[in-house]
């Protein structure tokens, strides 16, 4: 409730609202995805094809394990202020080749030592 009320205050100085984090969305278009996007939040198209975890299928990253998101309000039909920042691009970071260089650990074993989620990033233009 608080976030919804805050997002509707378009006269506030901080009206750019980005939703970031682990939403536990199993795959695009599942019920949690629909609940998230039905609020007016949208994820940029180029982030929809980024693998989210070490368990994602690299050839079909948008089909499952769609847990982490970077989203914002982009529609004027919701009555919420649109993001005033210009989105440039986004992606993910596969840390596996840098953290686990010479190891025989399984992906399951790695997930207990470090997060199995790849960090997402978004780049915006300077005003």
List each model region and its residues:
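Metal-dependent phosphoester/phosphodiester hydrolase catalytic core
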Residues: 1
């Amino acid at each position: 409730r608080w976030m919804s009320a805050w997002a509707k205050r378009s006269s506030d100085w901080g009206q750019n609202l980005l939703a970031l984090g682990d939403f536990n969305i199993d795959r695009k278009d599942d019920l949690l995805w629909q609940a998230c996007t039905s609020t007016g939040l949208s994820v940029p198209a180029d982030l929809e094809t980024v693998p989210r975890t070490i368990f994602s299928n690299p050839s079909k990253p948008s089909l499952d394990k769609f847990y982490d998101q970077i989203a914002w309000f982009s529609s004027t039909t919701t009555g919420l202020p649109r993001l005033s920042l210009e989105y440039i691009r986004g992606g993910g970071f596969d840390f596996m080749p840098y953290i686990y260089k010479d190891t025989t650990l399984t992906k399951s074993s790695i997930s207990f030592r470090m997060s199995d989620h790849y960090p997402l990033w978004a780049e915006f233009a300077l005003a």
